[in-house]
């Protein structure tokens, strides 16, 4: 899906890691929430509350989920799942355009 219709968008950006990750929250009519964002080249660790699906629209990254020693590479058109109440390490080598689906 290249477009989300009938949504509410929070104008104020979510800024993380000194601006290395910037996103906007989008809420759908049914209450579902997603964030649309960009991560600039960096090595970061994110913590999750709810389970997440990270959909990659552009860019390249390597990801290591909590409890794993294995790094996996993801690019445009791919996605990875992160359990709730967990974390993941991400190394972005090409600016990453993503959609984060919660729940």
Curated annotation (Swiss-Prot):
Annotated GO MF terms: guanosine phosphorylase activity; purine-nucleoside phosphorylase activity; thymidine phosphorylase activity; uridine phosphorylase activity
EC number(s) on file: 2.4.2.1, 2.4.2.2
InterPro entries listed in its UniProt record: Ppnp, RmlC-like_jellyroll, RmlC_Cupin_sf
Keywords in alphabetical order: Glycosyltransferase, Transferase
Catalytic activity: a purine D-ribonucleoside + phosphate = a purine nucleobase + alpha-D-ribose 1-phosphate; adenosine + phosphate = alpha-D-ribose 1-phosphate + adenine; cytidine + phosphate = cytosine + alpha-D-ribose 1-phosphate; guanosine + phosphate = alpha-D-ribose 1-phosphate + guanine
Cystine pairings recorded for this chain: none
Alphabetized CDD domains for the sequence: cupin_PpnP-like (cd20296)
Pfam families named among the record's database cross-references: Ppnp (PF06865)
PANTHER family: PYRIMIDINE/PURINE NUCLEOSIDE PHOSPHORYLASE (PTHR36540), PYRIMIDINE_PURINE NUCLEOSIDE PHOSPHORYLASE (PTHR36540:SF1)
Described function: Catalyzes the phosphorolysis of diverse nucleosides, yielding D-ribose 1-phosphate and the respective free bases. Can use uridine, adenosine, guanosine, cytidine, thymidine, inosine and xanthosine as substrates. Also catalyzes the reverse reactions.
Family: Belongs to the nucleoside phosphorylase PpnP family.
Name of this protein: Pyrimidine/purine nucleoside phosphorylase
The organism of origin for this protein: Cupriavidus metallidurans (strain ATCC 43123 / DSM 2839 / NBRC 102507 / CH34)
Taxonomic path: Bacteria, Pseudomonadati, Pseudomonadota, Betaproteobacteria, Burkholderiales
